[in-house]
């Protein structure tokens, strides 16, 4: 009887967590779809973005900047789009739109937060010997890289495997 109640609880928990994640993913999907005017530019088929693209980029930066990280982290492939990383990183500069630093995409913060600290638009000057405290966005000759890596697991998946492991023991 305990095992059956545990399975019922686990099933309900998984359903609730999955629906929450789908909701968050669909809001980003909608935000990314709204940026369809940028497709020619970020896929490398155009050398400059059009005004409609820049307007949409500005809207997404204001409403859900964390969704932009999905494009940089390979989210475009989920929509069947091959994103040119160099073009995508150059889009804010080409549109003259301030964005959060790309470094925020690899942290738990997603990319949210204030857009006023974008190094592309407001570089900080530092005194001699202090060094720069800015992170360049979309600059450099080579492809974007990261010194760190992360593996993303969904909480429901971890909970499921934990519950299955627990039930297998007892």
Curated annotation (Swiss-Prot):
SMART domains: AAI. The keyword NAD does not apply. It is found in: Cell membrane. Expressed in seedlings, preferentially in the endodermis of hypocotyls and roots, as well as in anthers, sepals and flower tori. Induction: Induced by Phytophthora parasitica-derived necrosis and ethylene-inducing peptide (NLPPp) and microbe-associated molecular patterns (e.g. flg22). Glycans are attached at residues 45, 84, 124, 130. Its main location: membrane. Disruption phenotype: Increased susceptibility to penetration of the epidermal cell wall by the non-host mildew fungal agent Blumeria graminis f. sp. hordei (Bgh). Increased salt permeability in shrunken and deformed seeds, with abnormal hair-like outgrowths. GO terms for biological process: defense response to fungus; lipid transport; pathogen-associated molecular pattern receptor signaling pathway; response to molecule of bacterial origin; response to molecule of oomycetes origin; response to nematode. Keywords: Cell membrane, Disulfide bond, Glycoprotein, GPI-anchor, Lipoprotein, Membrane, Plant defense, Signal. Residues 1-24 form the signal peptide. This is Non-specific lipid transfer protein GPI-anchored 5.
């Amino acid at each position: 009887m305990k095992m059956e109640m545990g399975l019922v609880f686990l099933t309900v928990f998984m359903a609730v967590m999955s629906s929450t994640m789908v909701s968050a993913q669909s809001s980003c999907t909608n935000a990314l779809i709204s940026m369809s005017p940028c497709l020619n530019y970020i896929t490398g088929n155009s050398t400059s973005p059009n005004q409609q693209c820049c307007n949409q980029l500005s809207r997404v930066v204001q409403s859900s900047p964390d969704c932009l990280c999905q494009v940089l982290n390979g989210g475009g492939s989920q929509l069947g789009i091959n994103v040119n990383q160099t073009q995508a990183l150059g889009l804010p500069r080409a549109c003259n739109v301030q964005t959060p630093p790309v470094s925020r995409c690899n942290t738990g913060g997603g990319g949210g937060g204030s857009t006023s600290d974008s190094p592309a638009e407001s570089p900080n000057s530092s005194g001699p010997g202090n060094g720069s405290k800015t992170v360049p966005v979309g600059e450099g000759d080579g492809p974007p890289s990261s010194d760190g890596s992360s593996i993303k697991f969904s909480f429901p998946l971890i909970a499921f495997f934990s519950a299955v492991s627990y039930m297998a023991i007892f």
